[in-house]
Amino acid sequence: MSKRLMTLLSILIVAGMLLAACGTKAAEAPAAKIKVCQITDTGGIDDKSFNATAWKGIEDAVTQLGIEGKYLESKEVADYEKNLNAFLEEKCDLIVTVGYLIGDATKATAEANPNVKFSIVDYAYDPAVANIVGQ
């Protein structure tokens, strides 16, 4: 090859590299909202106690942090497992359960789903369960 052709080819390669480096960055996907899901005990969401207080915390996080918050009310003890499974299907990032009555169902569900995060209000486990926080 002639010296001129080599010089031209080198300039084209360098120019191509510079143009590629200056290209716009691919648009990043917006971060998905964190979904926090609460299951009440049989007292309902407006019990003026633990259920209402926990839900108020989630509502505050929705407003201040931009998370997504949902709840399911348990009308009877038999609803606990059904509600836990519903939120597992919805792929909640954190499932908050409220009250000692839901403690056994929360533990069983957490142990069967170790990659899901749980929190329980008004209950503690001894020994602690690895994926249940806020005990």
What are these regions (language model features)?
Residues 24-135:
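A residue-level marker of the well-folded mature domains of exported/periplasmic proteins
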Residues 1-34:
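Short, low-complexity disordered leader/linker segments with a strong preference
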